[in-house]
Amino acid sequence: MTFKACIAIITALCAMQVICEDDEDYGDLGGCPFLVAENKTGYPTIVACKQDCNGTTETAPNGTRCFSIGDEGLRRMTANLPYDCPLGQCSNGDCIPKETYEVCYRRNWRDKKN
């Protein structure tokens, strides 16, 4: 009986997810990836809260964690060297610094890791 109840709950949750999905609420899944820097543990954090994607502007949701260095700041960083990056939070397409810094890295995934 418990197994049947679990199956019923899982089925109901799946049905609710299908009913609630809406591309306008959750953003275009086919959009462009935001550029990221990583912290010491490899956690990726976006470096800009707004970007151009094939002629349209994409904006990260308010409250998203970000490093306020911008795409150009990331491009100027030397790969795999530590930098102190200002940690912030996205607000209306801008990364607002929170007066805290975190060590961050630009990774070059094309490099071979020995």
UniProtKB/Swiss-Prot annotation:
Glycans are attached at N39, N54, N62. It holds the Pfam family EVA_Class_A. Keywords: Disulfide bond, Glycoprotein, Secreted, Signal. Residues 1-20 form the signal peptide. Changing D23A: No effect on binding to CCL3. Disulfide bonds join C32-C53, C49-C90, C66-C95, C85-C104. Its main location: secreted. Coiled coil: none annotated. InterPro entries: EVA_Class_A (IPR045797). It comes from the Eukaryota. Changing R110A: No effect on binding to CCL3. It is found in: Secreted. GO terms for molecular function: C-C chemokine binding; chemokine binding. Salivary chemokine-binding protein which shows chemokine neutralizing activity and binds to host chemokines CCL3, CCL4 and CCL18. Binds to CCL3 with 1:1 stoichiometry. Monomer. This is Evasin-1. It comes from Rhipicephalus sanguineus (Brown dog tick).
